[in-house]
A protein has these predicted regions:
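Nucleic-acid endo/exonuclease domains
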Residues: 1-101, 105-133
Length: 133
């Protein structure tokens, strides 16, 4: 498990490339923010986490299935991941960041375009809201 490295997963690359092609500029895996967000759009005061459905317990998702082997280990591990995610999102919100979570299953071919279009619309809406302040 210690050899599993974060960053530059295929789902993250899909989101990053789409955002770049839509004119957004960002930083990847910013370590000085809680949770080391996958994508940080400072101009929009927004962070994006691209979460794997298994590792982050996407409830109700067909891609999240409890492992049968070593069940107690996985239960503890995955619940700890979920609790950590919640703590980090609360802290980021407290610091004034907008937090967006994109799930791996939302980037499957049948949902990808709609998900990415909604993401861009949300970012532009957030930007417009922050300009009103």
């Amino acid at each position: 498990m210690s050899h599993i490295r974060a960053g530059k997963t295929k789902p993250e690359e899909i989101v990053a490339k789409y955002l770049f092609s839509a004119g957004f500029r960002y930083r990847r895996n910013v370590k000085n923010l809680p949770g080391t967000p996958d994508i940080v759009l400072k101009k929009y005061k927004t962070v994006i986490f691209v979460n794997g459905c298994f590792w982050h317990m996407h409830e109700g998702c067909k891609y999240f299935v409890w492992p049968q082997d070593n069940a107690e280990f996985w239960r503890k591990k995955l619940f700890a991941n979920k609790e950590r995610d919640e703590r980090e999102q609360i802290e980021l919100t407290r610091l004034g960041w907008n937090v967006i979570v994109v799930w791996e299953c939302e980037l499957k071919k049948d949902k990808r375009e709609a998900t990415l279009q909604n993401l861009v619309a949300t970012l532009r809406e957030n930007r417009n809201e922050s300009n009103k302040l």
